[in-house]
Structure formats: structure tokens, C-alpha cells
């Protein structure tokens, strides 16, 4: 497997992972009409615009071999929360892995890569938002040391509550041991400008 920074060319592949992950992780939590609106075409457009900005990286994990299939991705940025200092607090807006590959350590590896990026840029903390009812995701983050910090909001345009998690960005990010770690890979996504 290989990590790399996504390019604009990767938008369709990232969109496919994103939609597949949403369909499995959020079904029964997110309203059906929101999930139905989350199409590959819509996500491709969204990711094309995001990747074109070149402000912050989206890290992708590629399958070994010549195919270069994207297995998962993690987006990292400065915090977008009004109560956070975007100079010292980073954010993970999206972490997604193909559903059939969860529990094999890929999500953790992507998350570690994103935290390493924040550490490299001198950030002290990182936050992310998790749907309150997404117990597998919450367990995944808590197992890795993330803790709820009291931040709560509704997912853009819905009545679905989200909980904010926070972790310090250590000088040496936790890394997955050699091979893959058994655990729960999860999904998190927050796009307040979503229709």
C-alpha cells in the first residue's frame, strides 16, 4: 500500500470511496434523502472543487500493484469552527475507507498521516466531528485517544446531532505497527455548506 497526496485527477475515485462509505456507515442514522443526494457525480464535483483549492492535502491510500485503486482517504485542514484558533487547531473533515476493508488498520494509518501533517505544520490540537449515533466511529476514535470536548451541532440542514472530538497533536504521532491493525475503521464527514 502507498500513501500519497491526492490530485485533481483523483476526484472521481475519492468520490466512489466516499459514497460507498456513506451508504454503509450512515444508513439508518442520516435521513434517506440526504444519503440519496450523495451521489458519485455530486461528490466528484465537490471533491474536484476542494482539490482545486490546493490549500490543504487530502491523503489517499492506494492498493498495491499497478491498478492504483484508492482504498481510502483522509482530508486535513485548519479548524473551521468559530470557537477554535485555525492557527493552532487542525481538523479532519473526512476520513473514509472502502466498507469491505474496515477493521484492517487502513483508517488508522490515514489518520496518523493527517496528524503527522498537522504536527509538521506546528499545530497543537486536532478536532473532528462524528455523528452522535455513529457508535463504531466514536469507539474507533476513543480507542485512539480522541475525546469529546463538549462541542455539539446538527449536521448541515438536518436534525442529526454531531459530537466534536479532540486530540493533542503529539511530537511523534502514533503509528500503526507493521502490518495492519485489527480495529474499527470509521467514517467522519462534515460539510456544512451541503444542500
What annotation goes with each model-predicted range?
Residues 141, 146:
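Conserved active-site tyrosine of GNAT-family acetyltransferases
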Amino acid at each position: 500500500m502507498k500513501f500519497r497526496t491526492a490530485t485533481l485527477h483523483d476526484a472521481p475515485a475519492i468520490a466512489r470511496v466516499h459514497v460507498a462509505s456513506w451508504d454503509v456507515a450512515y444508513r439508518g442514522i442520516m435521513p434517506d434523502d440526504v444519503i440519496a443526494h450523495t451521489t458519485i457525480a455530486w461528490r466528484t464535483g465537490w471533491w474536484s472543487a476542494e482539490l482545486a483549492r490546493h490549500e490543504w492535502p487530502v491523503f489517499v491510500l492506494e492498493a498495491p500493484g499497478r491498478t492504483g485503486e484508492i482504498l481510502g482517504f483522509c482530508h486535513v485542514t485548519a479548524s473551521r469552527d468559530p470557537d477554535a484558533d485555525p492557527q493552532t487547531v487542525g481538523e479532519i473533515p473526512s476520513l473514509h475507507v472502502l466498507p469491505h476493508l474496515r477493521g484492517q488498520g487502513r483508517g488508522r494509518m490515514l489518520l496518523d498521516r493527517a496528524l503527522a501533517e498537522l504536527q509538521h505544520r506546528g499545530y497543537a490540537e486536532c478536532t473532528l466531528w462524528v455523528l452522535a449515533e455513529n457508535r463504531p466511529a466514536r469507539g474507533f476514535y476513543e480507542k485512539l485517544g480522541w475525546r469529546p470536548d463538549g462541542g455539539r451541532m446538527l449536521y448541515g440542514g438536518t436534525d442529526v446531532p454531531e459530537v466534536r472530538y479532540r486530540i493533542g497533536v503529539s511530537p511523534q504521532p502514533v503509528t500503526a505497527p507493521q502490518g495492519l491493525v485489527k480495529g474499527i475503521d470509521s467514517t467522519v464527514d462534515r460539510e456544512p455548506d451541503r444542500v
